[in-house]
């Protein structure tokens, strides 16, 4: 999930690449749960966002990584963006994705998927306020939102330590090859269209690890760590579109770069006390 190469390039640090086909990296021992995703297909885009709009979700000890600090570090897209829109220097960086999967289980239990049911996630890059603090393995991300289209399963995930909520999320592939996705939650409606085009990147040599921290306004306190390998991805070609409507903080975000279709990886995750 969440292809390491493109995310690293876009958000400003080196990718995790090995010289031989990569196995899924080992997670730390003693996970409280086991999350498995296989056969995923997803549409991903990247956004800058106003951190003040979600300040109440930021846990103590963490801070948002900003466009400005990435530009100061020499990240080309960030420097180019600030050249056009300098007011975005203090904004955070994030990604939004809609995912459907052949297998999606937590401790062996899967959601009751509606027709074309999918999961949606909005994740933001964060770092410790104390530069010397150790957040453990994996790129740190704040799980601003995670929506699944099964109310009982959302409760089950929260009980297991995952910061999930209910959302009416769908993702389907038309016979023409175009993907259509929708998200409908209180205060937010999202519609995305993507027709994958061009060369396929990634593949068996991609692998990485991430750590999802729950938002401060969640009843969940565990950290979710995920490890994955085998991403493939294609850029979305002509006719790609995103529509975000409503009062949700993501609606004011600024799209960064291209939208991508990603698939083919294997992911294993688990929850850990923070």
What does each of the following model-derived ranges do?
Residues 14-15, 166:
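Low-complexity, intrinsically disordered short peptide segments enriched in small/polar/basic residues
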Residues 16-103, 249-250, 273-274:
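N-terminal domain-onset segments
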Residues 4-13:
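Bacterial N-terminal signal peptides
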Residues 60, 66-69, 126, 143, ...:
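A short, solvent-exposed, low-complexity linear motif enriched for acidic/polar residues
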Residues 20-26, 156-274:
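Interaction-surface and assembly-scaffold signal
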Residues 90-184:
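Aromatic- and glycine-enriched beta-alpha-beta binding-site module
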Residues 51, 56-65, 146, 150-152, ...:
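Short, structured coil/loop segments at alpha-helix boundaries
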């Amino acid at each position: 999930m969440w292809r390491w190469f493109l995310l690293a390039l876009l958000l400003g640090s080196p990718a995790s690449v090995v010289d031989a086909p990569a196995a899924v990296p080992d997670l730390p021992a003693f996970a409280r749960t086991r999350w498995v995703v296989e056969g995923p297909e997803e549409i991903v885009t990247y956004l800058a966002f106003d951190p003040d709009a979600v300040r109440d979700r930021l846990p103590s000890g963490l801070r948002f990584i900003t466009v400005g600090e990435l530009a100061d570090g020499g990240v080309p897209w960030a420097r180019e963006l600030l050249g056009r829109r300098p007011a975005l220097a203090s904004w955070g960086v994030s990604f939004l994705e809609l995912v459907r999967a052949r297998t999606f289980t937590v401790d062996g239990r899967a959601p009751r998927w509606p027709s074309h049911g999918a999961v949606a996630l909005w994740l933001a890059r964060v770092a410790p306020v104390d530069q010397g603090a150790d957040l453990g393995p994996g790129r740190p991300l704040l799980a601003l939102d995670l929506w699944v289209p099964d109310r009982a399963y959302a409760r089950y995930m929260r009980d297991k330590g995952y910061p999930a909520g209910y959302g009416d999320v769908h993702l389907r592939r038309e016979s023409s090859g175009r993907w259509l996705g929708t998200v409908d939650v209180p205060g937010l409606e999202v519609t995305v269209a993507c027709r994958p085009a061009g060369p396929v990147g990634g593949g068996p040599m991609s692998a990485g690890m991430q750590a999802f921290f729950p938002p401060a306004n969640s009843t969940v306190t565990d950290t979710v760590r995920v490890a994955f390998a085998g991403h493939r991805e294609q850029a979305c070609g002509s006719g790609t579109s995103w529509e975000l409507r409503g009062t949700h903080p993501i609606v004011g975000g600024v799209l960064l770069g291209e939208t991508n279709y990603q698939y083919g990886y294997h992911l294993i995750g688990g929850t850990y006390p923070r």
